[in-house]
Amino acid sequence: MSFAGVLADADVKAALAGCAAADSFNYKTFFKACGLAAKSHEEVKKAFFVIDQDQSGFIEEDELKLFLQTFGAGARELTAAETKAFLAAGDEDGDGMIGVDEFVTLVKA
């Protein structure tokens, strides 16, 4: 599964280029730049299941580290600091993971 048909390739490339440098990732900026923030709740949920690579129903820290790579081959991994900040922003219930509803809330924030 990919983001084809949900997000425009040009928008995804621009979003990835905007955070190519280490410690430059900002989830709000990224979600707006790639167009995900403007999508419906259902489309955001589809994106969640692409990012949830092990299909556990949650995005864990190791999947967040590889977050950018789910949007484009050759993208960098998030740094440890970026990963922890991203997890803290999305993990509303403190279980150390981001569930689908938490992800929708994060994208739409």
UniProtKB/Swiss-Prot annotation:
Instruction: Kindly indicate whether the keyword Repeat belongs to this entry.
Output: yes
- Record: residues binding Ca(2+) 1: 52, 54, 56, 58, 60, 63
Q: Which domain of life is it from?
A: Eukaryota
Q: Which GO terms describe its molecular function?
A: calcium ion binding
Annotated positions of the N-acetylserine modification = 2
Q: Name one GO cellular component term.
A: cytoplasm
Task: Tell me which residues bind Ca(2+) 2.
Answer: 91, 93, 95, 97, 102
Entry keyword set? Acetylation, Allergen, Calcium, Metal-binding, Muscle protein, Repeat
By its UniProt entry, which PANTHER family does this protein fall under?
A: PARVALBUMIN, PARVALBUMIN ALPHA
Q: Which family does it belong to?
A: Belongs to the parvalbumin family.
What is the annotated role of this protein in its UniProt record? In muscle, parvalbumin is thought to be involved in relaxation after contraction. It binds two calcium ions.
The protein depicted here goes by the name Parvalbumin beta-1
Organism of origin is: Gadus chalcogrammus (Alaska pollock)
